[in-house]
């Protein structure tokens, strides 16, 4: 559609954004469904976040996606924050509700909705989650909000380790009747034990994504059983090596593409 005097604006806020595919994707959808919206990418550094949100208000933008380095900083300038975004301490989406700017973290919601669409509920379930980065943290928060019984997080003792342990402690305090624990990914015996008692196994690492598409983060196929749901946040390739191996063992599998859509 052509730009009119009523065209409303959406955008991507962060830096760098010049290689983002979001403008092409959103503008294609707006045109396809004849919506009078346009989506632009705005290169905004962390110290420009306040000015960017003021501009958002001034121009009455409908919404925005937030990427690094603004995902934490932006929370200071919003009117409302979703429970999950508050827990995670980061925001990747802003929606303008009649002048009230609300921040959301959609990774966890997308993950849960993707599972639900495939007939899998997390309430009362135990999840083993591989990786402790930003996506993992969002999944942890949303799973706890949706009633997961227990979450076992595995991560290498790298630069993210202390942050992962601290965040899990925050979540545990917020959800005392549920359990969340962080373990060393290199402790293969503990990893095997947790997977064997889990309902859902989720990969929230980059393993399986190019150039690691021929690698699975789980090499012991005996850990796959028919009752185990195996999921992956990686969506390219749509069916990772982990999912291929799990499917061959009879597991129900859920890829990451649906998470992106939801």
Predicted regions and their residues:
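Short, conserved loop/helix-junction motifs that constitute active-site signature segments
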Residues: 3-4, 122-123, 145, 218-227
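Residues at the starts of beta-strands that form the adenosine-phosphate
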Residues: 9, 38, 126, 149-152
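Glycine-rich adenosine-cofactor-binding loop
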Residues: 14, 103-108, 124-145, 155
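Conserved S-adenosyl-L-methionine
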Residues: 145-150, 249-252
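Rossmann-like adenosine-cofactor binding region
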Residues: 177-255
């Amino acid at each position: 559609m052509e730009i009119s005097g009523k065209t409303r604006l959406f955008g991507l806020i962060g830096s760098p954004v010049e290689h983002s595919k979001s403008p092409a994707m959103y503008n294609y959808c707006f045109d396809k469904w004849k919506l009078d919206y346009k989506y632009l990418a705005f290169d905004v550094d962390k110290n420009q976040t306040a000015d960017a949100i003021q501009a958002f208000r001034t121009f009455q933008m409908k919404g925005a996606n937030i990427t690094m380095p603004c995902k934490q900083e932006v929370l200071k300038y919003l009117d409302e924050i979703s429970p999950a975004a508050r827990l995670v301490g980061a925001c990747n989406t802003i929606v303008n509700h009649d002048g009230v700017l609300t921040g959301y973290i959609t990774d966890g919601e997308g993950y849960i909705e993707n599972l639900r669409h495939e007939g899998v509920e997390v309430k009362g379930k135990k999840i083993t989650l591989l990786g402790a980065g930003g996506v993992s943290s969002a999944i942890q928060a949303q799973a706890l909000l949706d009633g997961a019984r227990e979450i076992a997080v595995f991560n290498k003792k790298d630069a993210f380790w202390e942050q992962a342990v601290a965040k899990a402690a925050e979540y545990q305090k917020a959800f005392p009747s549920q359990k969340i624990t962080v373990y060393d990914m290199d402790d293969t015996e503990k990893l095997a034990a947790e997977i064997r008692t889990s309902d859902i196994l989720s990969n929230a690492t980059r393993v399986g994504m190019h150039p690691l598409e021929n690698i699975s983060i789980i090499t012991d196929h005996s850990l796959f059983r028919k009752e185990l749901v195996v999921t992956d946040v990686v969506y390219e390739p749509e069916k990772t090596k982990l999912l291929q191996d799990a499917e061959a063992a009879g597991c129900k599998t859920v890829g990451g593409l649906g998470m992106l859509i939801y």
